[in-house]
From Swiss-Prot:
Residues glycosylated per entry: N187
Compartment list: Secreted
SUPFAM superfamilies: Thioesterase/thiol ester dehydrase-isomerase (SSF54637)
Highest rank taxon of the organism: Eukaryota
Source species: Xenopus laevis
Signal peptide segment: 1-27
Family under the similarity heading: Belongs to the THEM6 family.
Keyword Cytoplasm listed: no
Any one GO CC term of the record: extracellular region
Name this polypeptide is given: Protein THEM6
InterPro entries found in the cross-reference section: HotDog_dom_sf, THEM6_lcsJ_thioesterase
Keyword terms of this UniProt record: Glycoprotein, Secreted, Signal
Originating gene: them6
Length: 207
């Protein structure tokens, strides 16, 4: 019995050492919670996801660690894409989505026990990807502590067809906000420079 317990504890310790177990557990719980919440039929409607800075989120300066913003943004997108039906539509079409680009700007630190909201909006899309904005808003004064822009690349289909599957009709992308236009140009310029440095042709799938 003691041997079995020791082996079990060893396996659990190994799993927690080799995998980010809490990320997968929390991600699954976020999706499950979103699935039982009311469906958000407006794809462009802003979605709010609540959070609080806990001790394990802190860096050496006792602020929320920079990497934690990206992690929390993941969970907020999971909730938004599930409640809006985006994940379900992609699954029905046999497609998937990956992060193809991300830029975050930090404006003010979030401190221990500080509560915040992540306000997620789908801004627009092109023939390959969705463009998403996420704002970290401190609830004490509604200040935007950080803002994140991401490019969610659709694999195995196109954003147009995914949206059409969700809305049961053809829907045009909203006009690109100015910051998205500049951000796309930056990404394109960076891709061209990296390809030139590595000798990769412009028709490569890797950007």
């Amino acid at each position: 019995m003691m041997l079995f317990l020791a082996i079990a504890l060893g396996l659990i310790a190994a799993i927690f050492s080799l995998l980010d177990v809490w990320y997968f557990i929390r991600g699954a719980l976020v999706v499950l919670k979103a699935r039982i919440q009311p469906v958000v039929k407006d794809l462009l409607k802003e979605h709010s996801y609540s959070g609080i800075v806990l001790p394990h989120d802190l860096d050496f300066l006792f602020h929320m660690n920079n990497s934690r913003y990206l992690r929390e943004a993941d969970f907020a997108r999971f909730a938004h894409f599930t409640r809006s039906g985006l994940f379900q539509a992609m699954h029905s079409l046999g497609s998937s989505m990956v992060m193809a680009g991300c830029t975050i700007r930090y404006r003010r630190s979030l401190r221990l026990w500080e509560t915040f909201e992540i306000r997620t909006r789908l801004l627009c899309w092109d023939d390959k990807a969705f463009y998403v904005e996420q704002r970290f808003v401190a609830l004490k004064d509604d200040f935007v502590s950080a803002v994140l822009m991401s490019r969610q690349h659709v694999i195995g289909n196109s954003p147009d067809k995914v949206v059409q599957s969700m809305c049961k009709r053809k829907v045009e992308s909203p006009e690109y906000p100015e910051e998205v236009v500049h951000w796309i140009k930056y990404n394109d310029s960076s891709s061209q420079q990296l390809r030139a440095e590595s000798g990769v042709s412009n028709n490569s799938k890797d950007e």
